[in-house]
């Protein structure tokens, strides 16, 4: 730990002044190499030199500088035999503590990379792992080389018999780009791994990576709450009233408009973590004080919560915006319980025929508006044939 602190202090001492880009360009190669060997990410290097611009730009500048300096990771095989015998496996990881790759790269665009779901909590990971494994099986069946990037040892997708190459490494932009530049694949599948791969889609697309299936722009239009809400308004689909708020006064004003209960969600959380239904003022204040730091940097999404509504899910696959297969399932609990924790029955047992018909129609409209090609999930609130979209 003293070495890490020493490297960071050295970077800061040398580069706590001047133009951001010049700071990165003047970073000594030996110091940068030492930082990478000790585990500093490009983000941490940019932060250590005091980069003041958009941090995503800072990461790209650091990346460009180290690539020009020849500071690149190498690929090593994980020794599954503890050095008892020479091990030849496709179980791989990247490191800066090496001089040559353990595997040979063809660079023939004949591989397809699947991004896994990473470390997920109990109740919301098995479906992503199943999707990833099915994608790997299909890739092989179609005659392509299958490549998986994931770091959860408890999943089937990280069994190195499942694919031609398994990178047991982190699902960050930096590491994924390092692997993609080595593999030079035909394309990348982000749609089977859940939130973490989806968050990388736009940044990978900006680097001219071929995203297979639904485009990065369409993924962003579904993931970005404001863009998705505007799209629903444009196609005439109902949704619960909501706002992204940055102060207690704004939250109080919105609650007075819609009344209790309200659903409160801090920004940038995975799998519905830290969501809470607040039924009165005391619960709202306690939750915001304990679980959410409300500010312009950390806005909170507050939604109208409809009591005694049923939550219904549409899981489907579309091609060029047209649904080709679907399944509608029904939550036994009332809305407000996360899908990963809820008890779900399929086929649905207690839905009105009109409710099912409307859900199908709305799903077709959303798939067409987003031009979806691949799997997707839409969550609905249903009460007395009144259908509202929660998210896609």
Summary of predicted features, one role per range:
Residues 1-13:
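Single conserved hydrophobic/aromatic residue that forms the stacking wall/gate
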Residues 17-34, 40-60, 68-378, 382-392:
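N-terminal beta-alpha lobe that positions the nucleotide/phosphoryl donor
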């Amino acid at each position: 730990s003293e070495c890490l602190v020493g490297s960071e202090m050295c970077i800061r001492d040398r580069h706590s002044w001047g133009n951001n880009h010049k700071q990165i360009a003047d970073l000594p190669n030996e110091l940068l190499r030492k930082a990478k060997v000790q585990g500093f990410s490009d983000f941490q290097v940019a932060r250590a030199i005091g980069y003041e611009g958009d941090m995503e730009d800072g990461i790209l500048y650091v990346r460009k500088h180290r690539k020009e300096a020849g500071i690149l990771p190498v690929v090593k095989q994980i020794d599954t035999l503890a050095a008892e015998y020479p091990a030849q496996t496709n179980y791989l990881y990247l490191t800066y503590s090496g001089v040559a790759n353990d595997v040979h790269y063809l660079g023939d665009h004949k591989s397809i990379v699947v991004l896994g779901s990473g470390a997920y909590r109990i109740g919301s990971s098995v479906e992503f792992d199943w999707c990833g494994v099915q994608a790997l099986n299909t890739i092989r069946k179609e005659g392509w080389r299958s490549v998986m990037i994931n770091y959860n040892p408890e999943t089937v997708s990280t069994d190195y018999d499942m694919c031609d190459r398994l990178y047991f490494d982190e699902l960050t932009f930096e590491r994924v780009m390092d692997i993609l530049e080595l593999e030079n694949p035909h394309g990348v599948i982000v749609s089977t791994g859940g939130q973490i791969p989806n968050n990388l889609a736009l940044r990978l697309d900006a680097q001219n990576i071929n995203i297979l299936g639904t485009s990065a722009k369409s993924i962003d239009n579904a993931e970005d709450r404001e863009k998705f809400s505007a799209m629903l308004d444009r196609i005439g689909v109902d949704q619960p009233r909501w706002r992204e708020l940055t102060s207690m006064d704004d939250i109080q004003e919105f609650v007075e408009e819609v009344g209790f209960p309200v659903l409160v969600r801090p920004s940038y959380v995975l799998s519905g973590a830290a969501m809470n239904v607040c039924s009165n003022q005391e619960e709202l204040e306690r939750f915001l004080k304990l679980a959410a730091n409300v500010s312009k940097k950390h806005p909170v999404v507050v939604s109208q919560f409809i009591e005694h509504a049923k939550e219904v899910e549409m899981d489907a696959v579309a091609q060029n915006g047209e649904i080709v297969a679907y399944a509608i399932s029904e939550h036994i609990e009332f809305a407000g319980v996360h899908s990963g924790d809820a008890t779900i029955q399929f086929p649905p047992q207690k839905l009105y025929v009109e409710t099912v018909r409307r859900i199908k129609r709305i799903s077709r409209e959303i798939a067409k508006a987003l031009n979806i090609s691949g799997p997707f999930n839409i969550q609905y609130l249903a009460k007395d044939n009144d259908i509202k979209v929660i998210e896609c």
